């Protein structure tokens, strides 16, 4: 019991420290006028999508020795915990968004596309999706986006890839505002798929 109490106390102190650190970081960012772009978090950054696509290729196509193969080497089940998500300037300074959502599926790209759309963003505006959907080698999703089927206990969410508007209305990171939202995306007047 004493050990559990000590761990509990340590966890409480860590949480208090994390909150204080977040407030300090936010104050520094605000006072130095770094609110538009920081840590590479802007729409034109052409690096992170490459890492995301490469990690997904490795996840699916690398064997236990790290050798890449054309055929997937393992089955995959993706779970996104969106019970309390983060919006705005994440992942460093996100604001909590209480959504009460769990997403899951057998393809990482398909699950991410559905999550992106549920958040109110146009997946076609993200380089990681457009590049990953057009791979010729080490294919991540071996079918077209139109083949994705969303199932939900919320009937209005079952057709999210074909609906206009935002479901959860997430606020994008500052460097992405006006670039990825469904309402501002170039294809906003047509079906998403």
Placement of each model-derived feature along the sequence:
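Extended, low-polarity segments enriched in aliphatic/aromatic residues
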Residues: 1-193
């Amino acid at each position: 019991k004493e050990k559990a109490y000590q761990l509990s106390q340590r966890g409480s102190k860590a949480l208090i420290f994390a909150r204080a650190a977040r407030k300090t970081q936010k104050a520094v960012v605000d006072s130095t006028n770094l609110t538009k772009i920081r840590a590479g978090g802007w729409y034109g950054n052409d690096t992170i999508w490459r890492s995301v696509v490469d990690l997904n290729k490795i996840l699916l196509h690398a064997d236990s020795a790290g050798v890449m193969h054309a055929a997937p080497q393992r089955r995959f089940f993706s779970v996104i915990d969106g019970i309390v998500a983060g919006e705005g300037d994440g992942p460093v300074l996100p604001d909590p968004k209480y959504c009460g959502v769990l997403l899951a599926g057998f393809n990482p790209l398909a699950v991410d596309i559905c999550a992106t759309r549920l958040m109110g963003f146009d997946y076609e505006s993200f380089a990681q999706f457009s590049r990953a959907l057009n791979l010729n080698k080490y294919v991540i999703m071996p079918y077209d986006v139109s083949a994705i089927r969303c199932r939900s206990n919320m009937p209005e969410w079952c057709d999210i890839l074909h609906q206009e508007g935002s479901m959860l209305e997430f606020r994008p990171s500052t460097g992405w505002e006006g670039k990825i939202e469904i309402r501002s995306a170039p294809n906003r007047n047509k079906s998403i798929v």
